[in-house]
Amino acid sequence: EIKGACAFAVSIYNIAIRGCFRTQESHRYFDEYMDADRLTDEERAGVLVVFGAFDSNVLCGVCGMTNEGHITMLYVHPQYLRRGIGKKLLERVRIYARMQLKIMQVSVNAMPAYTADYFRRVGFKSAYQGGFCNGQDDMYVPMTAKSIYQVEYTPRHIADKTFIAISVGFTCLVFFSGLIYAVCAGLTP
């Protein structure tokens, strides 16, 4: 499972991100980090958990979290961008941080730095002013967000006619259920 997630992340990195970095050191750092055997060992040791998003058994996104609440490996296939998959994966790891790890705040390094705008839109804040270099010329932005108990969805307005129809239907159901109970119990209405 981890090996599949690693292969997926590497392919997305090569397709969409590798060209964003200017130095070979950045590529080497990524390649070393994504060593499938090392990450498998981390998962077995409880240091890392990785979640996947699937579309009809096709892996379309991954996101990992360390046991310290650091989000890593958020990758969504370009064909699945702007469908809420990254947001759902982030929600899932934030819930995991709160419920399983008992961590109140999670962190992520937005890298490449331009991805910080995306993380801001989904509730993260910059941990420091500006960005930092990761030892090379390429920038990243450390960010944090609160972990969450559950996904909070914006309630939708229910049209008045729909609400009335549901209310009338429920009232009829209760009335007739009571009537049937009374008849079955031998009571006269």
Model segments located where?
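A short helix-loop-beta-strand connector motif used in the catalytic cores of GNAT acetyltransferases and
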Residues: 34-51, 70
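Conserved beta-hairpin
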Residues: 47-61, 66
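Conserved acetyl-CoA pyrophosphate-binding loop and the N-cap/start of the following alpha-helix
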Residues: 53, 80, 84-92
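Conserved acetyl-CoA binding element of GNAT-fold acetyltransferases
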Residues: 66-79
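Conserved active-site alpha-helix within GNAT-family acetyltransferase domains
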Residues: 87, 110-129, 133-136
